[in-house]
């Protein structure tokens, strides 16, 4: 292993959260580096399904200091999002260290030691910005399905060609599930969409009639941990997922998708719904979200579900350790490209004043 490098602050992750944190650290004149495990900025976006478009309009997708290109109420593609992040890093000359995946973070005296396979680092402060969506989550009974049924997670889904012709069950009725279900239906599949109705925030209509301002104000200020309705929404979102934004339940029904209750388990190798019905399907697409994966952080800062204890991203009892980009960290927008900047600014200011 080469000589250890020391920085005042290290940001782990070069996605939207890490770049936003880097922007404010650069404004402060900090000695810092952004470590990312991929060889190219935006890889996480490029690896999503082919037709994916952001669930929020372009005018709400800018990081601090650089608006997202595109007209109002235009929903950018996932590749446009990736290109934007890459351009952002170049514009602000952010010190990205690609191909540097940290596999261990631990305390070392009054600093933190970070280790990768080829390099060791030390830092007074560490901002973990590895994203809200890490390891695909499946129900425990997924393995009980008949092996003849094709299974894949939304993380691995790219396009309908991966899914055999016939009947498809999409499990999870959030944004990803609804969008994938609509695409499969358009491609000629017979589709069931299983899951709880997560509600709908009509971004299209709000943007059309009010320039989108009430919509963004709602999801970034009202639906935050600072309001009673926001705290209630936080608990709901963490359990059931975000409300639909671009698509809605009416779109699903009009497309001819059959809406089904939540999945209860497996019976005789077939998906079993909560109403007692079993479905005879050829494929299942699990749009069941992601779970946190922080096994590489060797610090006692997590609850029983592997979620870090924090107050607005500040980890109590671990001076100098912070998170940015967590799911509903402070608001419904916390993990979105257009929302991470607010939390990144708070964290970097807090760190500077500590």
Model-derived features: where do they sit?
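Flavin (primarily FAD) cofactor-binding/catalytic cores of flavoenzymes
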Residues: 2-38, 42-44, 73-354
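Glycine-rich flavin
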Residues: 54-73, 222, 226-229
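Short, flexible helix/strand-to-coil boundary loops that buttress conserved ligand/catalytic motifs
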Residues: 45-49, 56, 67, 205
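Aromatic-lined carbohydrate-binding/catalytic grooves of carbohydrate-active enzymes
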Residues: 40, 49-52
